[in-house]
Amino acid sequence: MAISPLVLLGTVVLILLIIGYVEASNHHRIIATIPLRIHVNGTRGKSSVTRLIAAGLRAGGLRTFAKTTGTAPRIIDAEGKDRFIHRLRSASIGEQIRLMRYFANEKPDAVVMECMAVQPEYQWISEQKMIKSHIGVITNARPYHLE
């Protein structure tokens, strides 16, 4: 008895949908353990503003982690120490999910994330599906990366 290609395709699609649902549910459960999430976006100055916000929160007694992007992406830990992020492949907004899991395991009071998405569609995904910030910060908005 041969399996119809349509049945096989439908089964594969169903399995992928279930896997996607489980991953999304797990991610939402993980980020819900972070009491304060701040997402910094804008054309210029995101890394500096991310660092300043994180330093201010730490000075106020909150256990705060931060992540900056760019050519030298860094994690700023709860003590304010920079750690370089070694990437094995090119930058992708998907790394935000892995970092949120890492931060949640560290039991922070707050996480400050610099938006690493360039295209508006990816910025929306990064905010609405990955970070789900309590506070959004826009440093400035100028035409850039329009190619």
Residue spans for each PLM region:
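Short, basic phosphate-binding NTP loop
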Residues: 1-41, 48-55
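ATP-dependent carboxylate-amine ligase catalytic core
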Residues: 28-34, 56-136, 140-147
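PAPS-dependent sulfotransferase catalytic core
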Residues: 40-43, 64-65
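Alpha-helical architecture
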Residues: 44-45, 112
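Charged, low-complexity surface patches
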Residues: 45-46, 92
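Short N-terminal binding/cap micro-motifs at the start of the first secondary-structure element
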Residues: 46-50, 73-76
